[in-house]
């Protein structure tokens, strides 16, 4: 049995990850953190898990060592505390954007600032198993690809392997949940339901 813990578990990504892991035969979820919900039952943030687990959220300071640590933090937070996280588990899977790009110069181009810890970026395997399975299996650190990049890559990879692509136009339609559970006028479902709006059409960082 693989003992896993989740950091940043009160958001949509953390909640869905927890749901998948709770029903995985090879994993046992030991801890899940949320500063906002610390001490409260997981179902207070994720009502769909009310009868699935008795876990309660804990703080980062309460985290104990585990086999695999899964990080679901906002952009920039993983790299800030990477030394702390790496001391807790020999294997880390990061669902944020902090280590997706293996080239610090490419990171600076897309994110508009230098990478805070450039010596680490090459240590992460790119986490799309359908195209990078062997590297992921051998890695101790994995950076999961973004949602738009995953959809685009999986759609185009078979064509690219056969050299059938001359040019590409990708038109992504994202629902209101893609913006996460932090409220804003742009992400408020009644405001955006049934509407189509362009969002950073030329320089969206999740293209990478």
Predicted regions and their residues:
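N-terminal Rossmann-like NAD(P) cofactor-binding subdomain of oxidoreductases
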Residues: 1-201
């Amino acid at each position: 049995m693989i003992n896993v813990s989740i950091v940043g578990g009160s958001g949509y990504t953390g909640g869905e990850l927890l749901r998948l892991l709770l029903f995985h035969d090879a994993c046992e979820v030991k801890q899940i953190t949320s500063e906002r919900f610390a001490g409260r039952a997981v179902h207070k943030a994720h009502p769909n898990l009310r009868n699935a687990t008795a876990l309660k959220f804990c703080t980062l300071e309460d985290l104990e060592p585990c086999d695999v640590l899964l990080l679901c933090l906002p952009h920039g937070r993983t790299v800030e505390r990477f030394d702390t996280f790496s001391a807790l588990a020999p294997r880390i899977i990061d669902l944020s954007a902090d280590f997706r790009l293996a080239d610090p110069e490419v990171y600076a181009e897309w994110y508009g600032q230098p990478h805070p810890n450039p010596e680490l970026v090459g240590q992460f395997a790119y986490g799309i198993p359908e195209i990078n399975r062997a590297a992921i299996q051998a890695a101790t650190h994995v950076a999961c690809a973004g949602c738009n990049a995953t959809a685009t890559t999986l759609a185009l990879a078979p064509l690219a392997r056969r050299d059938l692509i001359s040019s590409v136009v990708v038109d992504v339609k994202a629902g209101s949940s893609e913006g996460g559970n932090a409220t804003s006028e742009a992400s408020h479902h009644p405001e955006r339901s049934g509407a189509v709006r362009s969002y950073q059409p030329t320089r969206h960082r999740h293209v990478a």
